[in-house]
């Protein structure tokens, strides 16, 4: 099936080189926020299938703690849109032994969107595999060969991957993998456009960015008569979040630089959480939170 060629996210996790300097003091990756019709069932799924644990965000909100970041859930009345038409493609965990990890998932009843697939040729790394899980509310979750089994990456799509990557470097202190300046030349794998691309690091999370042109080839039905991304808000993966030690300063710096602020600073959970929202490249919703992610 076409999406079985959508794999370079796995390769990027191991094939990264040197990094470019940060342009601003770094933020920290804070969370992935999902919409779901059944938060309790979703939490059961993630904590039983992957290396993560139940925890209460701010001591009050049931969620999933995955090493250094949160997975948070909003309950919605009907199934959230899950077609790959926004700039958030998927997120995923690593596996030291992909064959064993895949079989364990199969034996436990996990449904797969894409079965175990060998992409050693692409990765130039013998025994390199990936698979896509059909998660709660049809969230797409990748398992891929890695040197760990933690929550490891978020894979995005962009009309300009290089510019998008530079935006995350500038505003969130993400570190770009690669020795040479990023290439803007198109690159293809088995007919699918996978470049230009960017691979960035924010704490434990590898942020990988592929070109928008990948999506219509991999998901033609969803992209029929479509030219642009849907906003991520309201979809199964609603947004991602980054934290700053001083949210007010960070938000004002971004605002002065022309970043669109979509929600001003608010507080929640008896003022224990301070947050705001901005719009990032390709209509991605990004939450800014004060204070680094931690398990209560």
Segments the model singles out, each with a brief description of its role:
Residues 8-18:
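Bacterial N-terminal signal peptides
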Residues 24, 30-71, 76, 121-127, ...:
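Core segments of cupin and vicinal oxygen chelate
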Residues 20-22:
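Terminal presequence/propeptide segments associated with secretion/organelle targeting
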Residues 27-37, 62-65, 80-157, 178-201, 242, ...:
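Vicinal oxygen chelate
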Residues 73-79, 141-144, 209-220, 288-289:
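Amphipathic N-proximal alpha-helical interface segments
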Residues 47-51, 96-97, 103-110, 169, ...:
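Sec-exported extracytoplasmic/periplasmic mature domains
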Residues 1-6:
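N-terminal secretory signal peptides that target proteins for export/translocation
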């Amino acid at each position: 099936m076409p999406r079985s060629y959508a794999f370079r996210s796995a390769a990027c996790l191991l094939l990264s080189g040197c990094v470019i300097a940060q342009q601003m003091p770094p933020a920290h990756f804070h969370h992935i926020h999902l919409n779901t019709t059944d938060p309790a069932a979703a939490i059961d799924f993630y904590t039983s299938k992957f290396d993560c644990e139940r925890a209460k965000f701010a001591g009050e909100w049931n969620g999933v703690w995955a090493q250094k970041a949160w997975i948070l859930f909003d309950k919605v009345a009907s199934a959230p849109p899950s077609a790959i038409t926004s700039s958030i493609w998927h997120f995923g965990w690593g596996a030291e032994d992909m064959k064993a990890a895949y079989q364990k998932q199969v034996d436990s009843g996990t449904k797969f969107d894409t079965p175990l697939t060998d992409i050693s040729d692409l990765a130039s790394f013998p025994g390199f595999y990936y698979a896509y899980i059909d998660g709660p509310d049809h969230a797409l979750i990748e398992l891929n060969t890695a040197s760990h089994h933690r929550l490891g990456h978020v894979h995005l799509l962009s009309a300009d991957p290089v510019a998008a990557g530079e935006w995350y470097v500038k505003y969130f202190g993400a570190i770009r993998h690669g020795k040479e300046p990023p290439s803007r030349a198109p690159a293809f794998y088995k007919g699918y456009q996978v470049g230009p691309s960017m691979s960035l690091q924010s704490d434990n999370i590898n942020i990988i960015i592929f070109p928008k042109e990948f999506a219509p080839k991999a998901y033609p039905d969803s992209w029929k008569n479509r030219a642009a991304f849907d906003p991520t808000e309201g979809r199964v993966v609603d947004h991602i979040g980054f934290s700053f030690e001083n949210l007010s300063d960070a938000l004002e710096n971004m605002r002065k630089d022309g970043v669109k602020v979509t929600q001003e600073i608010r507080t929640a959970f008896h003022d224990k959480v301070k947050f705001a929202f901005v719009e990032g490249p390709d209509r991605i919703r990004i939450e800014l939170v004060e204070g680094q992610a931690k398990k209560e």
